[in-house]
Amino acid sequence: MVDVKLLIDKYYKGSPELREILWTHSKNVADHCVRIARQHPELNVDLEFLEEAALLHDIGVVFTDAPGICCFGSAAYICHGYLGAELLRKEGMPKHARVC
């Protein structure tokens, strides 16, 4: 199991407001994903991976410029997906990177 909070803290330590926004959103997404997957046991979903991936799917927003949600990076917000994927691959998480 990946320590998702530790990984998020590594990249968001200087942005507590953004970290809280990201965590609240990602936790809601993860809760919905897991709830839906549990309603469909016939799919044999890897619930641990699903929850981790949902919690990390927007990790790249820290690199973007979206002041309305406390993002003060330089990239366009639309880039957060591929930037998050690059970050997760760098962290040795290529499977999780595919979800960004």
PLM features: what roles do these ranges have?
Residues P16-R19, H40-N44:
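Residues at alpha-helix boundaries and short interhelical turns
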Residues N28-R35, Q39-H40:
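A positional/architectural concept
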Residues M1-L7, L55, M93:
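Short coil-to-beta-strand
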Residues E42-C100:
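Divalent metal-dependent catalytic cores for phosphoryl transfer on phosphate-bearing substrates
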Residues V2-H25, G60-G73:
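Active-site flanking loop/helix segments enriched in acidic
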